[in-house]
Amino acid sequence: MLYPIPIAKLIESYSKLPGIGVKTATRLAFYTIGMSDEDVNDFAKNLLAAKRELTYCSICGNLTDDDPCHICTDSSRDKETILVVEASKDVSAMEKIQEYHGYYHVLHGLISPMNGVGPDDINLKSLITRLMAGEATEVIVATNATADGEATAMYISRILKPAGIKVTRLARGLAVGSDIEYADEVTLLRAIENRTEL
């Protein structure tokens, strides 16, 4: 069905979001049209504010409104461990369990040979620089249990072990193919406690 151009453009915009197909995008577009002008303005303002006011921490790569982020500036955290994750949402998931007290490093992606993504395409160089200049003695790789997550973990292990840095991986309480973001807190806690060396 053909929609008026403004609705069609809104549907197209919603369709660009991950996990949103045309049907859901259409529902969201029509819901948005039915919202009050005040709610639509607030929604638009919040979108723009998030885009303008957020940045990536210059140390760990986490999404933040202050640079460096509040985690990197917290001197009470364990300086000996850095937990490496794919995305900022994974930092939030790990922080919820309140059991990991070290620092983080966000890769902003995974090595994916099938998709043409190599080590230079993700935030790895700054991790190496950080490790060579800092006090960390262990890197915990917390990438998802997928082929790309495993490839990334093995690459990190291969480049860091010769430098004498202990590289561990979250234990397998996480199902293969699962996302850390959706794991419950007990599963994440067990995965950290029972991590294995790579």
UniProtKB/Swiss-Prot annotation:
A zinc finger (C4-type) spans 57-72. InterPro entries: DNA_Rcmb_RecR, Rcmb_RecR, Rcmb_RecR_Znf, TOPRIM_dom, TOPRIM_RecR. It holds the Pfam family RecR_C. Residues 80-175 form the Toprim domain. Keywords: DNA damage, DNA recombination, DNA repair, Metal-binding, Zinc, Zinc-finger. The keyword DNA repair applies. One of its GO terms (molecular function) is zinc ion binding. May play a role in DNA repair. It seems to be involved in an RecBC-independent recombinational process of DNA repair. It may act with RecF and RecO. This is Recombination protein RecR. It comes from Streptococcus equi subsp. zooepidemicus (strain MGCS10565).
